[in-house]
C-alpha cells in the first residue's frame, strides 16, 4: 500500500526544524510521497525550495508539487522542475492547477479569476515543449520566448 502525505500550512508558524523532521520521518517510515502545495501567502514552505531540499535529503521518497504557475515564468519554471527531477533521480510528481481560490492571493499574483484557465492553457504546453529539448519560439500577450532551449531536461519523459 502506498501512503502519500500532503503538507498544508498549519495554525502556527513554519519552521525549518519541523520541515526537516517531517522529511526525515517520512523517508524513515517508508511513506511513498510528500506533496507540497503552492500557497504564496500561507506560512508554508515553497514547493520548489522544499522539494529541492527533500531531494537532497532523501533517496526514495517521491516529491509531489501541487503548483500554481500564475506569477511564474514558464521557462524558469520548466528549468527548476527539470532540475528537481534530475537532483532526485526522477522522483518528481507534478500537478499543475489553475490557481488559488482566494481573491487576495489571485490579486497578489496579478491574475483575475477569469483568466486562470486561459493562463494554464498557455503554460502547460509551453512546459512540455521546454522539457522536450526543442527550441521554443513563442510570442503572446503574456510571454515572449525568442528561440530558447531549456537544459537540463527532466529524467522522466514525460514529466
Regions found by a protein language model. Name each.
Residues 1-58, 62, 157-158:
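N-terminal beta1-alpha1-beta2 module of alpha/beta enzyme domains
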Residues 2-14, 70-142:
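Flexible, glycine-rich active-site loops centered on histidine and acidic residues
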Residues 35, 65, 108-112:
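Short amphipathic alpha-helical segments at helix-loop
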Residues 40-42, 68-71:
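Short histidine/acidic/glycine/proline-rich micro-motifs that form metal-
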Residues 47-48, 77, 148-149:
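Distinct, well-ordered alpha-helical segments
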Residues 61-67, 92-93:
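A short, small-residue-rich loop immediately preceding and capping a beta-strand
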Residues 142-150:
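Active-site glycine-rich loop that binds ribose-phosphate moieties when present
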Residues 151-159:
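Short, intrinsically disordered, charge-balanced linker/junction segments flanking boundaries
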